[in-house]
Amino acid sequence: SGILNPVTKIDILKETPTTAVLDANDGMGMVASKKAMDMCIEKAHKYGMQVILDVVFNHTAEGNEKGPIFSFKGFDNRIYYMLTPEGWYYNFSGCGNTLNCNHPVVQQLILECLRYWTIEYHVDGFRFDLASILTRDEKGTPMADPPLLQAIACDAILGKVKLIAEAWDAGGLYQVGSFPSWNRWSEWNGRYRDDIRQFLKGTDGMAGTAITRITGSKDLYPEPRGDSASVNFVTCHDGFTLYDLYAYNTKHNEKNGWNNTDGDNNGNSWNCGAEGETDDPQIEGLRRRMVKNAFATLLCSRGPAMFYGGDEFCNTQFGNNNAYCQDIIISWLDWTRQE
């Protein structure tokens, strides 16, 4: 049965794949009409849900400098991308290229995009993927006061929307607790995730650190920012699901095609006595208690709580902690697990 059953009672979510705003049999899928998107957001608002749009302004699909031309490379390569003196792409995104976000042209593009979603679709906020890239200048150097982030924070149209940063990038820049905020930006608290995972699995010496995280991470978010700047989470779309966190000691990404070399190798997981699916009722019972422990800790912590869709009914990705590339049962929500 589900851990948080009420979360699963919204019919439109049960009928909607996570990769589309319409029913999968509709024929339009991810390229649904504006009307359908409006309807989806309106329905969410009717149920008292706010809609936070995940936006990726850190790279495009063109890969590295040897990749194809899909979008901005053909317009003005030097304006839209961070380039080395030799003309190669800086790769702070892990995807082969990095968008030159603080160039005035790119900055204006991003601002207009955010305004459009706010005005036309009435989204309630934005979560910025690998947001530390948005703090870098054209050479990749982090800036104390990035013009793009300041412009977003001070924009009149965006003044009431929520701004949430994934405060790190694939180039090693980690800004949890130090992301430029103008008292507007919240952050995914990656320290909360890592420390609470270790505490819950029984790692020695973590009790004091866990108390700090549960009580609002004041070491990271002192006033005036405070605990409202800390988006607490134990799991997200990157990494193990919450059930898998207590069902697998190691990742199992073999079906991704990279010989299990992709994905995080340090998930602080614990399989509770058996690797993967098991019929042992004691092990399965322990796993469900651990999931409940994680939810109880998360929901009793100071600051906004976030959990991964499906964790409330112990959804599994069968040990795959990098399932973005899978469109099979590995990445699907199995609603029968709430029964």
Identify the role of each PLM range.
Residues G319, A323-S331:
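Aromatic-rich peripheral "rim/lid" segments of glycoside hydrolase catalytic domains that contact
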Residues D23, G96-L99, S132-I133, C272-E284, ...:
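Glycine- and acidic
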Residues A44, D54, W117, F128, ...:
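Conserved, mostly hydrophobic/aromatic
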Residues Y308-F313, Q317:
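Short acidic/histidine-rich active-site segments
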Residues H122, E138-K139, M143-G309, Y324-Q326:
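Conserved alpha/beta catalytic core and glycan-binding cleft of carbohydrate-active enzymes
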Residues S71-P85, W185-R197, I328-W335:
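Acidic, His- and aromatic-enriched active-site or binding-groove loops in soluble protein domains
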Residues S1-H122, L130-C154, L173:
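Substrate-binding/active-site clefts of carbohydrate-active enzymes
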Residues A20, T336-E339:
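Short, intrinsically disordered, charge-balanced linker/junction segments flanking boundaries
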